[in-house]
Curated annotation (Swiss-Prot):
Chain spans, region Shikimate dehydrogenase: 1298-1590
Compartment(s): Cytoplasm
Protein name: Pentafunctional AROM polypeptide
HAMAP family per record: EPSP_synth, Pentafunct_AroM, Shikimate_kinase
Organism of this sequence: Pyricularia oryzae (strain 70-15 / ATCC MYA-4617 / FGSC 8958)
Biological role: The AROM polypeptide catalyzes 5 consecutive enzymatic reactions in prechorismate polyaromatic amino acid biosynthesis.
Length: 1590
């Protein structure tokens, strides 16, 4: 039988049967006939997943029906054949979540319902999940029925479908319950791969690489060579091909080869060892560790991705054990990476997909302990001995200690080296020479076989980058020991896709910057530039001098982030101009080498002139010139000009072979181990003839320190002095070997005397500030160092007196790590060195050498902390405020500076100070507008460079008029800085500008100016504050709460998400209003009891960004709580058009600019939209959501997993909303949520069901439940409840325990506190009660406050002082006031609680005064007055001080009491006893607030009344005009007192005592419940005196 192309398929024998059938087009043209003719049955059951069902099942049903009918009609049998066989189909949700006991049972029950019998044939159509699980169903159903595999993924084709392993997953791990059950057929139809997503295809390549790595070196080489072609085809979008099914046509032969190759190997091994007795273990290479990773990270990480990382770790383990050569490890890693598979758990994609979930080593080892290959407790791992070969023909026994070292992020080095040890160590190839050799060979013509190339992160980045630029092709020989580079003579092209990511490879970044300038645009014209970028540290390292030199030679280079650092965009100009190039070479010699190596390809011969002082690291420049000569270009050093070089034009001629000398910097570490331990070490291939300056280390550093040094032209041997007898060097200039200073420093730490090292200033701008790093980390050993301008001074200690460091931090710097490993071998104590793997930059196998060659014992360890370094971090970056003049920039800037504790600077004011003139006069002078703008830009750039942290700068309104200023601001945003646009309504701006004479007059209409500047303001800023607060009289305005919240968010100081995660129940109210403006009275009531408010943008009447900005600003000012910004599409249950992705993205950008706390992003949005939002989110939290309003997804199976996984990838919070039809749906949801939280506890989940029957899920959700409110026009979703309703339900379920609250004191019978709190409890749905406990004896309340159901208490006279000793803690406010009026139980552990005493009397006073117009900020100083000296007086003083009033006068009869009170407060309160009347004096702070604390009934002392009258009648000063003057009466009855009447007659405002009662109770309620009612509600309850409803 033939396939679609007319050819016969390829058959592979397994277990004596040719049951594996491979070709294109089998599914519709071959499978049905083969089944009917060779595996007959009355019932065929096709089981697949819901993703594949619609794609492949209908067509197969048609083909099956036709073939079955034809077979029946063509039969001539007598009697006639039975009726045609039936074909049943069943679909399950896709993903690893379906590979479970529940799904298996569901399928089995369905098979029984369909009356399937033992002759049934099951067809498993799908990937590994389907094949594994359906195979297990077949193995157990009716005690075993026949089944066939139809793998649709590459991984299933080459691995899981072959061999008869079937299984399901359990909580303990993958595939732990299953059976060996061989399929009767395995139909491998390669056409399925055309529709396989790229990630799934790449996932399968891990198994292909694995098979070649253990079995076939030739096939492995083919995989290396074919990686670019395979990836290119796989990543071609289906839409880009004329026929989507032809996407992989260019690699069809390659595909068939790799599938056949892998399938044949597996079939051979299975045939020899079906039940995994030994040989079949080899197929588990990478799986022992990989399966453990997968068990922890499933289902977010795919099997092949976990195995890829597992292969790397198991290869590193083989290297650590001395079995596998480092070059083979490097080759395997490069091959895996070339297929875009992860090679580390730190891979950014894995981190994002798993929500940053870690794989603790202890858990990984525990997962590995249940591996089926193990024998008892002995772990068995497949160890490679070479590419294509294993150490044993089975898995090998490996101790946990060795595994732990390889898995751990840190290593604890145990001191001790065997006395008399003599070793030979060959370090890896020189990093400097390796990188130069790669550049030269790629730019050269013809093949070049490079030997001893360094296999490290740096060279990997270089190789990958050259490959992307199509500068050369690469292949490996001699098991990865030789790299063959086929250079293309300088023909390079800008990369068509992606940027050049260089990690922290500084050498590569400098060299490739100039190489990128040689690139031409890509052949398709799509790529006209090259972007070079790196990790966070790389983005701080300098490259400015090199960029300046290239720019001066005609190359356009753009900084995409921080000025003078990566990332940069280099135009593909096809080469730079040449001629004379001047370069500052005092920072890095790599700048010089970069230009030297690329110079032959310039458009004219180059003369390179080094300026600015003596070039740094001259030996490295000499090395570059010597190597260029080896490749056929002879550089001439000028004989007439200092530091000048002449480079001819030409093309490098590649030598047939080039051997990279071992790295002399790396060689210093084994030599230093010998030196510090008194042993002997020989480096056989570095001597006096070396090109490298560091080769002088042994002679110029170690010999003076007391070592015996023997050095020939090609080798170096060092023998250290007896232990503890190293001698310090008074001074050594290490400028020729700067990288080696770290090694010298650790030796100096245990040498006698003081060693001074100079000439190493460039080491401050390497991977870290190495000089400071050595000083700080040596201090942990008790070694004292001094930093010098260009070096370090180390005072040695005896090695026996070294202190034990808690840990050594390595700054992600390989040389720091290796240097401290040297010191660790003689430390009196074991030393924990963090960031073990950073040595991979130059010597990936260093720890293996230290362990295997020097015999140093070490243990892998997971540190408790990841860093001991502290810094200001990005949160302290200076902020630039821009906007129109009069928009409130200075006010907002001062607010920011105040709340963040930073320095405010107005750049216009600073410019006037520097030029000693006003801006209007400057513009009128010969300087003019042009000169002013020039000064303005210069000042802006200076502030960005010299004050990058700790400042808030207010810029002039016209700063954006200058292109250079706009470029600087845009660059600042890109580099992670904050530029804030402040805006308010234009009418307010006009009002201000019409009377502002401090700036030049407008020469055109203001609105025209704003319209012109508006797009510039937008592009120059990344945050925007639209203010309803910034009035004309800005100096008198206090910072609004919403602005403080905004600033907290954009500067990374918001803690809201952390706070709500800690709460047992939290809510957000969903607004369903078309315009916030029309509901300003409703919204404050609707948000009560919620922790956030959701703005349903899709429900607004206008979706324009301008309208939405105003809506967000108004909502933020109204409700003063975090905002959830939601654009819900139609298909997700909202009203925003599904197809308007651009509109949705524009709105998301509005949200991020406005610094909202949460943005809801639907997971059905296109990937590019989601990626754009998540990359730009800053400190905004993403709620990754998916809604199923049609109820098509079930919580019982794995249907929700694909959405959960995607949400976990992108979200800080996950929101999944289904539909409920039965109560069971709610319980299934709860089970799903519990399981997901157990797997990823750091990522909270909102999971609930819509519909009436889904209300229970809302009650039980717990975290951030969406709610409605009676005041809103409609609920946002079917079944949505109010927060109060949910609390009522929770109390019925005992999820909110009923608490008892009290009022303590005497007399209290007339107190209105019970009605206040009981009403508020009822309104918010809380089950609590508040009652009076009248007593004047504090002992009578002790049992009550320690009861388990005690919820809190109000305390009044006479117990406010007596209660304090009975409490566990007192707030600072209550301590200062000296009285407690509120008791708050604070949970601590397991039902226990501490009692905290607080005082809300002063809070009530402050709130009442603010409501009356009093602010804490005023135009000029003002004083306050307290009448009386009783218990309330102290709270009144505290309240006035908190509002900034000073001095504070006390009017009272008893002078002694006043003195006592005054002396008990800090002097800064400035409390004065007012005797008699208060007379006006020049410059005095006039009183603006009087608080009366004396009884309102009975006679008041005449002296007090006279003093009060003198205060009330004191004339208001001109500067105080407009300030509120208020008397606050603390007495409750009568409602209008004599004191209030006097104040009113004097023109003062008054506040009755009941307001304070209501306010202090309002604050108490918030402290007890964390719910903030509308104040007017509390006030109304108290004022109206409604009867107690309880």
């Amino acid at each position: 039988m033939s396939t679609a192309n007319g050819s016969s398929p390829t058959r592979i024998s397994i277990l004596g049967e040719e049951s594996i059938i491979v070709d294109y087009g089998l599914w519709l043209n071959y499978v049905t006939h083969d089944l009917l003719n060779n595996i007959p049955s009355s019932t065929y059951v096709l089981i697949t997943d819901t993703n594949l069902h619609s794609l492949y099942v209908p067509q197969f049903e048609t083909a099956f029906t036709s073939a079955s009918a034809a077979a029946t009609s063509n039969s001539s049998a007598t009697p006639p054949p039975p009726r045609a066989p039936r074909l049943l189909t069943y679909a399950i949700p896709p993903g690893e979540g379906s590979k479970s006991r529940d799904t298996k049972a569901e399928i089995e029950d369905w098979l029984l319902e369909q009356q399937c019998t033992r002759d049934t044939v099951i067809i498993a159509l799908g990937g590994g999940v389907i094949g594994d699980m359906i195979g297990y169903v077949a193995a157990t159903f009716m005690r075993g029925v026949r089944f066939v595999q139809v793998p649709t993924t590459l991984l299933a084709m080459v691995d899981s479908s072959i061999g008869g392993k079937t299984a399901i997953d359990t909580p303990m791990g993958k595939n732990l319950v299953g059976a060996f059950w061989q399929p009767r057929r395995i139909y491998i139809d390669l056409a399925f791969l055309n529709t396989l997503p790229a990630r799934e295809f790449i996932n399968g390549m891990a198994e292909v690489i694995k098979t070649a790595a253990i079995w076939d070196a030739e096939e492995f080489s083919a995989l290396e060579q074919n990686a670019p072609a395979i990836l290119s085809a796989v990543r071609t979008p289906a839409s880009a091909a004329a026929d989507p099914n032809a996407r992989l046509l260019p690699i069809s032969d390659i595909l068939k080869r790799i599938v056949l190759g892998s399938a044949r190997v597996k079939a051979h091994i299975v045939s020899a060892d079906e039940k995994e007795g030994g040989l079949r273990n080899l197929l588990n290479f990478g799986h022992s560790i990989g399966h453990a990773f997968e068990a922890i990270l499933t289902p977010q990480v795919l099997h092949g991705e976990a195995v890829a990382v597992g292969m790397v770790k198991e290869a590193e383990l083989a290297r650590h054990l001395g079995i596998l050569r480092p070059a083979a490890v490097a080759r395997l890693v490069k091959c895996i990476a070339s297929y875009d598979l992860p090679i580390s758990l730190e891979d950014k994609r894995l981190v994002r997909m798993t929500g940053g979930k870690s794989c603790p080593v202890d858990i990984v080892l525990a997962k590995m302990a249940v591996d089926k290959k193990n024998e008892g407790k002995q772990k068995k791992i497949v160890l490679l001995s070479a590419i294509g070969k294993t150490h044993e023909p089975k898995a090998s026994s490996v101790d946990d200690r060795a595994i732990r070292v390889v898995l751990s992020a840190a290593v604890r080095v145990q001191p001790g080296v065997r006395p008399g040890l003599k070793v030979d160590v060959t370090p890896p190839g020189s990093k400097s020479i390796s990188n130069r050799a790669l550049i030269l060979a790629a730019l050269g013509k013809g093949p070049c076989r490079i030997k001893n190339l360094l296999h490290s992160d740096d060279t990997e980045h270089m190789l990958n980058a050259i490959g992307k630029l199509r500068g050369a092709s690469f292949s490996w020989e001699d098991d990865g020991e030789i790299l063959v580079v086929e250079g293309r003579g300088g023909q390079l092209f800008a990369p068509s896709e992606g940027e050049l990511y260089l990690g922290n490879a500084g050498t590569a970044s400098r060299f490739l910057t100039t190489v990128a300038a040689l690139c031409s645009p890509s052949s398709d014209g799509d790529a006209t530039s090259t972007v070079l970028t790196g990790n966070a540290r790389m983005k701080l390292r300098p490259i400015g001098a090199l960029v300046d030199a290239l720019r001066s030679n005609g190359i356009n280079i753009e900084y995409m982030g921080k000025e003078s650092s990566l990332p940069i965009r280099v135009d593909a100009a096809g080469g730079f101009g040449g001629g004379v190039i001047e370069l500052a070479a005092t920072v890095s010699s790599q700048y010089v080498s970069s230009l030297l190596m690329a110079a032959p390809y310039a458009k004219e011969p180059v003369t390179l002139r080094l300026v600015g002082g003596k070039p740094i690291s001259q030996p490295y420049i000499d090395m570059t010139i010597a190597m260029m000569r080896s490749f056929g270009i002879d550089v001439q050093r000028s004989t007439t000009e200092a530091d000048t070089y002449h480079i001819p034009q030409g093309i490098y001629t590649n030598p047939a072979e080039y051997t990279v000398e071992s790295d002399a910097s790396s060689a210093t570490y084994p030599l230093a181990v010998a030196a510090i331990t008194g042993t002997t070490c020989t480096i056989p291939n570095i001597g006096s003839a070396s090109l490298q300056g560091d080769a002088r280390f042994a002679v110029e550093v170690l010999r003076p320190m007391g070592c015996t040094v023997e050095q020939s032209a090609s080798s170096t041997t060092v023998t250290g002095p007896p232990l503890g007898q190293l001698k310090g060097i008074p001074h050594v200039d290490m400028e020729p070997m700067t990288d080696a200073f770290l090694t010298a420093s650790v030796l100096a730490a245990v040498a006698s005397g003081t060693t001074q090292i100079t000439g190493i200033a460039n080491q401050r701008v390497k991977e870290c500030n190495r000089i400071k790093a050595m000083k700080d980390q040596l201090a942990k050993f008790g070694v004292h160092c001094n930093e010098l301008d260009d070096g370090i001074e180390v005072t040695g200690n005896s090695w026996t007196e070294l202190t034990e460091p808690r840990e050594i931090y390595c700054y992600d710097d390989h040389r720091v790590a290796m240097s401290f490993s040297v010191l660790s071998v003689i430390s009196p104590h074991p030393v924990l060195i963090l960031e073990r793997e950073c040595t991979g930059k130059t010597w990936p196998g260093w720890w293996d050498v230290l362990s295997g060659v020097f015999g140093v014992a070490m243990d892998g360890e997971e540190p408790l902390s990841h860093s001991t370094v502290t810094g200001s971090g990005p949160n302290n970056r200076s902020v630039f405020v821009i906007g129109m003049r009069g928009a409130g920039k200075s006010t907002a800037g001062k607010w920011m500076a105040s709340t963040l504790g930073r320095t405010f600077m107005d750049l216009d004011t600073e410019l006037e100070r520097r030029h000693n003139t006003t801006i209007p006069d400057m513009v009128k002078s010969e300087v003019g507008w042009e000169g002013f703008r020039k000064f303005e830009v210069e000042l802006l750039r200076e502030m960005m460079e010299t004050k990058p942290e700790g400042y808030i700068f207010s810029c002039g309104g016209g700063i954006v008029e200058t292109p250079e200023a706009r470029e600087a601001l845009i660059s600042y945003c890109r580099a992670g800085g904050a530029v804030l646009l402040v805006h308010r309504d234009t009418t307010h701006v006009l009002e201000y500008l019409n009377r502002d004479k401090s700036r030049p007059a407008w020469s055109e209409e203001i609105e025209k100016v704003y319209i012109r500047r508006k797009p510039w303001y937008q592009e120059c800023s990344n945050f925007e504050y639209h203010s309803p607060h910034l009035g004309v009289e800005e100096s008198a305005v206090e910072m609004p709460v919403d602005f403080a919240r905004f600033v907290s968010l954009i500067c990374g100081k918001s803690s809201h998400l952390r706070e709500v995660k800690a709460k047992p129940h939290s809510f957000f109210v969903s607004l369903t209003v078309p315009n916030i403006t029309a509901h300003t009275a409703t919204i404050p009531k609707a948000v009560v009891g919620s922790d956030a408010v959701e703005l349903r943008v899709d429900l607004l009447q206008d979706h324009s960004p301008e309208f939405v900005v105003r809506q967000v600003a108004l909502l933020r000012s109204l409700c003063k709580m975090p905002i959830i910004f939601t654009v819900r599409t139609v298909s997700q249950g909202g009203r925003f058009p599904d197809a308007d992705h651009a509109g949705a993205l524009a709105l998301y950008r509005v949200a991020l600019r406005m610094g909202v706390e949460y943005v809801d992003v639907e997971m059905t949005m296109p990937e590019d939209v989601i990626e754009t939002v998540t990359k730009a989110k800053g400190y905004t939290s993403i709620i990754a959501s998916h809604h199923d309003p049609k109820g098509t997804l079930s919580w019982r199976n794995g249907a929700w997993m694909q959405y959960y996984n995607k949400a976990l990838h992108y979200g800080d919070v996950i929101k999944l909303v289904g539909w409920c039809r039965t109560d069971e749906d709610n319980f299934s949801l709860l089970t799903f949520k519990t399981r997901m939280l157990a797997a990823h506890e750091s990522t909270p989940i909102i999971a609930l069901n819509m519909g009436e029957q889904g209300k229970l899920s809302r009650v039980l959700n717990g975290f951030m439940t969406p709610v409605t409110h009676a005041a809103l026009p409609a609920a946002a979703a079917p079944g949505q409840l109010t927060a109060a309703e949910i609390r009522q339900a929770l109390s019925l379920l005992s999820k909110i325990p009923k608490r008892k609250f009290y009022l303590f004191g005497k007399p209290i019978s007339k107190s209105r506190s019970p009605i206040l709190h009981n009403t508020l409890f009822q309104q918010t749905g809380l089950p609590h009660t508040y009652s009076r406990l009248e007593t004047d004896k504090v002992a009578e309340v002790e049992t009550t406050i320690r009861a388990s159901d005690f919820g809190g208490a109000s305390v009044t006279i006479p117990l406010k002082l007596d209660i304090m000793p009975m409490l566990d803690e007192i707030t600072d406010a209550a301590k200062t006031i000296g009285a407690v009026n509120t008791i708050i139980p604070v949970p601590v552990q397991a039902g226990k609680q501490r009692l905290r005493g607080d005082n809300t009397d002063w809070c009530g006073m402050v709130h009442s005064l603010r409501m009356a117009g009093v602010t804490g900020k005023r135009a000029c100083p003002a004083s306050g007055v307290v009448v009386g000296s009783g218990g309330t007086t102290r709270a009144a003083i505290f309240a006035l001080h908190s509002l900034g009033f000073s001095p504070i006068y006390i009017i009272a009869r008893n002078a002694t009491s006043v003195e006592t009170i005054a002396s008990s407060f800090p002097a800064e309160y400035d409390i004065r006893n007012l005797q008699g009347t208060l007379a006006y004096t020049e410059g005095m702070a006039r009183p603006e607030v009087v608080i009366s604390t004396i009884p309102a009934t009975g006679d008041v002392d005449e002296g007090i009344l006279m003093a009060v009258d003198s205060v009330l009648t004191l004339p208001m000063g001109t500067s105080n005009t407009g300030a509120a003057r208020v008397l606050l009466e603390m007495a409750y009855t009568p409602t209008f007192t004599n004191m209030m009447a006097r104040a009113k007659d004097a023109g003062w405002g008054t506040v009755p005592g009941f307001e304070v009662l209501a306010a202090q109770g309002w604050f108490q309620f918030q402290l007890w419940t964390d719910i903030k009612p509308v104040y007017s509600t509390a006030s109304s309850i108290v004022m109206n005196g409604t009867s107690d409803s309880s």
